[in-house]
C-alpha cells in the first residue's frame, strides 16, 4: 500500500497508531525531540480528524508515551523557555518500523533492563550530535573512562600516602568496684607522614604496675558479691533450701562466705526487731507472732527448732498459759507493760464503756479436728468439774463483756471431750 500524500488526507481517521503518530512528530522536528504540546500540535495540523475529540486521543497518546520503551523523557534545561519535559525516540528503536513506514510496525520495542541501565550509565550507541542519544548523554563514554581512571588514581594515591590504619585499641580494662583505672593519654592528631602505631603505647594504661593490688581487689570484690548473694538469698528462707538461682556448690560457698564475713543485711529481721523483744525470743524461744498459727496450721515438732533458729520472729504458740510457764521457767524478766509474748497488754484491753470485747471470740464453734490421744498437761482440755480461768487474768476491763460469750463455748467443750483444743489467739 503506497503511502498517502498530504493532499489525500481527509476527515477520516488515519491508518496510524498513536505510537506511529508520536514517532512521526518527533522525527519531523529539528532537534529530534518535542514537548507534549508540540506533538499534539503536529498531529492536529497534519490530520484534521484529530482536531475534534481532543481529550480522548490525547489521553491515549499520553499513555503510549509513558508505557512504551521506545520513547524517552528528557528534562528541560534551565536555559530553555517553556515548561514540561521533552520526548525523544530511543536510539535503538530505528528498525521498529518496516522500511521506515509508519503504517506497519514490526514488533513492539522492548528495552532490557541491563541495556537500559547501560544506556543511562553512558554507554549509548549514539554519538554526540548524531541523534537523540547525543542530546541525552554527549559525554558519558569519556566520563566513564575518566571516572575509572580517577578512581584508580585516588586508590593509588591513598595507597602511597595513607597506610592502612590498624584497628582501634581495645577499651581499658574495667576493674570491678572501687579500683579506679587511670585515664588514657590523649592521642596527637594523625599526620600522613607519621605511622599510626606510635601513639598506641601511650594509650595503653599501666595495668601490670600493681598486680598484687589488682588480685587483692578482685578477691575482695568476689567475697563481697558472694556475701551479698548469700544475704539476699538467706533472708526469710530456711537454711536447708539453697537461694533462688544458685546451685548447691554456689549456695554452700555463699553460706560459708556469709558465716565468715558476718555480713548482716540492713533489712534483716535481727535489725528490724526491737531490743525489748530479743530477750524473750532468745531465752524462751517464744516469738512475737506466729504466721503458721495465724493461718491455723499446726507446726510439726521436728520443724519447731528449725523455725525458731532461722526465723526468730516466727514460731508456734498454743496458749497464754504455756507461754507464761515457759517464760517463767527460763527466768526471763518481762516488763509489766508486756505480756509473755512481748505484746503490750494494754493494747489488748479496751475501756469499760465499750460493748465489744477486746479479744475476738468465735461465736459459733469451729469444726472439730481428729481426736488426739495424748496432750501435754499444759494443753489438756478442762473437764466439766474444773472451772475455766476467769477472763480477768487476761484483762480486767474485758471480763464483763466476754463472760456471756465464753459460757456456751465452755459447755460445748465439756460435751465434746474427744475433740482437740480450740485455743483463742490473743495477739494482733
Swiss-Prot record:
Subcellular location per the Swiss-Prot or TrEMBL entry: Nucleus
Main function: Transcription factor.
Ranges of Low complexity composition bias in the record: 193-217
Keywords, in A-Z order: DNA-binding, Nucleus, Transcription, Transcription regulation
UniProt DNA-binding residue ranges: 12-103
PROSITE patterns: FORK_HEAD_1 (PS00657), FORK_HEAD_2 (PS00658), FORK_HEAD_3 (PS50039)
Stored SMART domains: FH
GO molecular-function terms, A-Z: DNA-binding transcription factor activity; sequence-specific DNA binding
Protein name: Forkhead box protein B2
Compositional bias per record (Pro residues), positions renumbered to this chain: 164-174, 183-192
Compositional bias per record (Basic residues), positions renumbered to this chain: 136-163
GO CC terms, sorted: nucleus
InterPro entries per the UniProt record, alphabetical: Fork_head_dom (IPR001766), FOX_domain-containing (IPR050211), FOXB1_B2_FH (IPR047389), TF_fork_head_CS_1 (IPR018122), TF_fork_head_CS_2 (IPR030456), WH-like_DNA-bd_sf (IPR036388), WH_DNA-bd_sf (IPR036390)
Disulphide-bridged cysteine pairs: none
Region (Disordered): 118-217, 408-428
Top-level taxonomic group: Eukaryota
Amino acid at each position: 500500500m503506497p503511502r498517502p500524500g498530504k493532499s489525500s488526507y481527509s476527515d477520516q481517521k488515519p491508518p496510524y497508531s498513536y505510537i506511529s503518530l508520536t514517532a512521526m512528530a518527533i522525527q519531523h522536528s529539528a532537534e529530534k525531540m518535542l514537548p507534549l504540546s508540540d506533538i499534539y500540535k503536529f498531529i492536529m495540523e497534519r490530520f484534521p480528524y484529530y482536531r475534534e475529540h481532543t481529550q480522548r486521543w490525547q489521553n491515549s497518546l499520553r499513555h503510549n508515551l509513558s508505557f512504551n520503551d521506545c520513547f524517552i523523557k528528557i528534562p528541560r534545561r534551565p536555559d530553555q523557555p517553556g515548561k514540561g519535559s521533552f520526548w525523544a525516540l530511543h536510539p535503538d528503536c530505528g528498525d521498529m518500523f518496516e522500511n521506515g513506514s509508519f503504517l506497519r510496525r514490526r514488533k513492539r520495542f522492548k528495552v532490557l533492563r541491563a541495556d537500559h541501565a547501560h544506556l543511562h550509565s553512558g554507554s549509548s550507541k549514539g554519538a554526540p550530535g548524531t541523534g537523540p542519544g547525543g542530546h541525552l548523554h554527549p559525554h558519558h563514554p569519556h566520563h566513564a573512562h575518566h571516572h575509572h581512571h580517577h578512581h584508580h588514581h585516588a586508590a593509588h594515591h591513598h595507597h602511597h600516602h595513607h597506610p592502612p590504619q590498624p584497628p582501634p585499641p581495645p577499651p581499658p580494662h574495667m576493674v570491678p568496684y572501687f579500683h579506679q583505672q587511670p585515664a588514657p593519654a590523649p592521642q596527637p592528631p594523625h599526620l600522613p607522614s607519621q605511622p599510626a602505631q606510635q601513639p598506641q603505647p601511650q594509650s595503653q594504661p599501666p595495668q601490670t604496675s600493681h598486680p598484687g593490688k589488682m588480685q587483692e581487689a578482685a578477691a575482695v570484690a568476689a567475697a563481697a558479691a558472694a556475701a551479698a548473694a548469700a544475704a539476699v538469698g538467706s533472708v526469710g528462707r530456711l537454711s536447708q533450701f539453697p537461694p533462688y538461682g544458685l546451685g548447691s556448690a554456689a549456695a554452700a560457698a555463699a553460706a560459708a562466705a556469709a558465716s565468715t564475713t558476718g555480713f548482716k543485711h540492713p533489712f534483716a529481721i535481727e535489725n528490724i526487731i526491737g531490743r525489748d523483744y530479743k530477750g524473750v525470743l532468745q531465752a524462751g524461744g517464744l516469738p512475737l507472732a506466729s504466721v503458721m498459727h495465724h493461718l491455723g496450721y499446726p507446726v510439726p515438732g521436728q520443724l519447731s527448732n528449725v523455725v525458731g533458729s532461722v526465723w526468730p520472729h516466727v514460731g508456734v504458740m498454743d496458749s497464754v498459759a504455756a507461754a507464761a510457764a515457759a517464760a517463767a521457767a527460763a527466768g526471763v524478766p518481762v516488763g509489766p507493760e508486756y505480756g509473755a509474748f512481748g505484746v503490750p497488754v494494754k493494747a489488748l484491753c479496751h475501756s469499760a464503756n465499750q460493748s465489744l470485747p477486746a479479744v475476738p471470740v468465735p461465736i459459733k464453734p469451729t469444726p472439730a479436728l481428729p481426736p488426739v490421744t495424748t496432750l501435754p498437761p499444759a494443753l489438756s482440755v478442762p473437764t466439766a468439774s474444773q472451772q475455766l480461768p476467769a477472763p480477768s487474768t487476761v484483762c480486767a476491763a474485758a471480763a464483763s463483756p466476754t463472760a456471756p460469750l465464753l459460757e456456751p463455748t465452755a459447755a460445748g467443750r465439756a460435751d465434746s471431750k474427744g475433740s482437740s483444743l480450740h485455743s483463742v489467739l490473743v495477739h494482733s
